């Protein structure tokens, strides 16, 4: 692990999000997840604040390259989502292109109001995206089931959503998902990304190492 490059990246990302430092954590945790082999890719947005975009700082892509990561970027064709420039980061160009392709298919399978238009494509796209992002299969499966069946967000669901990071954990396998994904990522963040760890630990409503 190139600790020096990681710290330089963290510094630049937090400088960009200086007004709302908590917004820096998704980028850094996504990159860390790819670096430790927990997830094949990460999906981010080229955010814009005060007229400047994250990747206007040309040093950031150079550091990602230094870390052995590939960066792809692009916009979706659907008007509702075209205003965002999406960033696809992974260890190979092929993985980034896979994520980009499946995210395009996902966006085309829903309406502007979020209604599923093509159930088969929507389900396949979510399964593929979940796998490319390294999410536990049990969590992806429950998310798909709840959406397809139109289940309400009950108290149990909202409590799981409130205490966990990264993705929506399933009801039955929440603990296994946490220990197989969240905990491993959080331990790496604690070791390599001090600013990110500080911000994440400050949110006492979210699980950290237990």
Where are these regions (language model features)?
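A conserved ligand/cofactor-binding region detector
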Residues: 1-117, 125-128, 135-210
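Glycine- and acidic-residue-rich phosphate-binding/metal-coordinating active-site segment common to enzymes
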Residues: 121
């Amino acid at each position: 692990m190139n600790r020096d490059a990681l710290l330089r990246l963290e510094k630049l990302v937090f400088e960009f999000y200086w007004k709302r430092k908590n917004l820096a954590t998704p980028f850094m945790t996504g990159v860390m997840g790819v670096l430790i082999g927990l997830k094949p890719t990460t999906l981010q947005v080229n955010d814009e604040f005060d007229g400047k975009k994250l990747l206007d700082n040309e040093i950031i892509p150079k550091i990602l390259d230094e870390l052995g990561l590939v960066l792809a970027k692009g916009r979706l064709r659907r008007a509702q989502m075209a205003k965002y420039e999406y960033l696809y980061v992974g260890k190979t160009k092929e993985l980034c292109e896979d994520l980009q392709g499946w995210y395009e298919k996902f966006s085309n399978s829903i309406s502007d109001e979020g209604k599923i238009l093509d159930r088969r494509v929507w389900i396949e796209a979510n399964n593929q995206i979940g796998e490319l992002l390294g999410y536990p299969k049990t969590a992806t499966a429950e998310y798909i089931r709840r959406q397809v069946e139109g289940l309400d967000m009950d108290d149990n669901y909202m409590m799981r959503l409130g205490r966990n990071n990264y993705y929506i954990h399933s009801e039955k396998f929440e603990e296994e998902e946490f220990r197989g994904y969240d905990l491993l990522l959080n331990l790496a963040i604690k070791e390599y990304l001090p600013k990110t760890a500080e911000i994440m630990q400050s949110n006492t409503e979210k699980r950290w190492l237990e």
